[in-house]
Amino acid sequence: MSGGLAPSKSTVYVSNLPFSLTNNDLYRIFSKYGKVVKVTIMKDKDTRKSKGVAFILFLDKDSAQNCTRAINNKQLFGRVIKASIAIDNGRAAEFIRRRNYFDKSKCYECGESGHLSYACPKNMLGEREPPKKKEKKKKKKAPEPEEEIEEVEESEDEGEDPALDSLSQAIAFQQAKIEEEQKKWKPSSGVPSTSDDSRRPRIKKSTYFSDEEELSD
């Protein structure tokens, strides 16, 4: 099969089912005809009791067709059931969507705590082995080339003057530049300057010893 699941062609509509059958019961009954992807029993919205109608989504349309031919008009627990390929009502995408039930403290079937639906006492056909959880594969990050790693390490020293090979030289060099800039932009009197000089950028002492000063507004 190509193109993924096709609910409009691989979903079997089954009616006149015994009301006592659970999702797990139907899963076990219909799995003999092919890979069952999802079982949906129609229930009363108030009482949550089965209406005797269910949709069985198979992995492929051949399994669905084999199922309808095998069980249509056949007896199941004393009831003659009807089976046919379900008619698409435009809600196929919603039907196929996986639903996650995060509350694992209660059984989905009966609402009682202490067990999950796979082991619910209401399952007429007994317990069903839970499906194996798929392991999430962690995407491995491609290792960066060694050349790039070396460049990153070297980039930490970008902007420094090669002549400043010691910390004391760097401090002296930086301080001299700061004093020189302060003299250049220092106003001649104590009166605040209203000229364009007041709007010129001032040099702020950098905490990082390099030949790149930080400008303050």
UniProtKB/Swiss-Prot annotation:
Conditions for induction: Up-regulated by morphine. Down-regulated at 30-36 degrees Celsius while it is up-regulated at 39 degrees Celsius.
Keywords linked to the UniProt accession: Metal-binding, mRNA processing, mRNA splicing, Nucleus, Phosphoprotein, RNA-binding, Spliceosome, Zinc, Zinc-finger
Alphabetical list of PROSITE patterns matching this protein: RRM (PS50102), ZF_CCHC (PS50158)
CDD domains associated with the record: RRM_ZCRB1
Protein's cellular compartments: Nucleus, Nucleoplasm
Phosphoserine found at: 155, 210, 216
Domain RRM: 10-88
Zinc finger (CCHC-type): 105-122
Compositionally biased residues, Acidic residues: 145-163
Record-linked InterPro entries: Nucleotide-bd_a/b_plait_sf (IPR012677), RBD_domain_sf (IPR035979), RRM_dom (IPR000504), RRM_dom_euk (IPR003954), ZCRB1 (IPR044598), ZCRB1_RRM (IPR034219), Znf_CCHC (IPR001878), Znf_CCHC_sf (IPR036875)
Pfam families attached to this UniProt entry: RRM_1, zf-CCHC
Quaternary structure and partners: Component of the U11/U12 snRNPs that are part of the U12-type spliceosome.
Protein name, UniProt field: Zinc finger CCHC-type and RNA-binding motif-containing protein 1
